[in-house]
Amino acid sequence: MAVGIFDSGLGGLTVLDAVTKALPDVPLIYMGDNAHTPYGVREADDIYDLTTAGVQHLFDRGCDLVILACNTASAAALRRMQEGWVPEGKRVLGVFVPLIEALTERQWGDNSPPREVDVKEVALFATPTTVSSRAFQRELAFRAIGVDVEAQPCGGVVDAIEDGDMILAEALVRSHVDALKRRMPNPQAAILGCTHYPLVEDVFRAALGDGVAVFSQPSLVADSLGDYLKRRPEMLGSGEPAFLTTGDPKSVEAKATIFLRRKITFEAVG
């Protein structure tokens, strides 16, 4: 039995690591589309095609439930997938919902009208495609009113992390935070809207300064998955744990080992 985790590259390993710690008895199959990363500058149709292909690999491996641990895929492809592609008996979940639950302190099953929440000014850091989709703002509007969201497209950060150039990644983060703070000097909360960003979370926190509540996805997604599986234990599929990639396994293994600080063996898929 296994739950699938899909990402455009290595960022989803932050989610996998959090899920492994929170739910050690849940086997996981990870699928990284490293051959086509990053998704953050691609067109929506391209992202949809790549995401469905990646998720299909996980379905073929016996997963009934797949987490899109990629905000760009969640923003650009998830709704379309859920409306017309996901087979009966399968589920694909995104990573926005746990964030919004935490930010608004409202459970997703709470279908009462949107209401005012304590947080009024929110900084959103995400890929260019996620920002342009306005998916986060759209989902937030179902739950809260009176929240000003200032979004910063963080071009180059994912590329630098995937290339292992953390010095460049950290410099880009500081630049993007400075750019946002010129438009919103004192955000109450900051959303790290990409699963790569926890790898540079300390840089975001330092650049934002004290007093800003930073919401990072891995632990929120892990907790949400735990709650979901308590309600739907039948969604644990029949697959065996594995790490899959569309890229070069040896290259991906080397970078993934640095991220997780443990040896991982990847298997190539077409």
UniProtKB/Swiss-Prot annotation:
It comes from the Bacteria. Gene3D superfamilies: 3.40.50.1860. The lineage of its organism: Bacteria, Pseudomonadati, Pseudomonadota, Alphaproteobacteria, Rhodobacterales. Pathway: Cell wall biogenesis; peptidoglycan biosynthesis. GO terms for molecular function: glutamate racemase activity. The active site is at C70, C194. The gene is murI. It catalyses: L-glutamate = D-glutamate. It comes from Jannaschia sp. (strain CCS1). This is Glutamate racemase.
